[in-house]
Amino acid sequence: MDFGLSQDQRLLDESLRKFLTSEVPLDSVRKLAAGESSDASVWQGLASMGLAGVLIPEAYGGAQLGMLDAVAIAEALGYAACPGPFMSTAVMASYYLEQAGATDPLAAMAAGTYRVGIAFSDAIGTR
């Protein structure tokens, strides 16, 4: 059994890391931590690579990849300390909206023009 990434996943990872190295320098992360707003062009760049729609079906403009692909992307984004709505929009919201049959926003999410924020209350994890 092979638990490694496929050749396609390795190529995606390599392309993504090159993009992040050039587009998300550590200075931009420090500025964001200091309270400056994030650069929307980074999210649009990720969307143009198809990453905003990683789990969204092709019928809605997504890449229709799998959860392992999403994990590999999240790992690369985390390594670069890349801010953005990847987990909330491209993974959590797209997955649950599709499962619920609420497909109207998926095309805009895949295009990177619609971002979703996920909120958790204090009640989660408490008894």
Question: Which ranges hold each PLM region?
Answer:
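Intrinsic disorder at enzyme termini
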Residues: M1-D8
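A structural signal for short hydrophobic/aromatic patches embedded in well-ordered alpha helices
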Residues: L12-D13, I73
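Glycine-rich flavin
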Residues: T21-R127
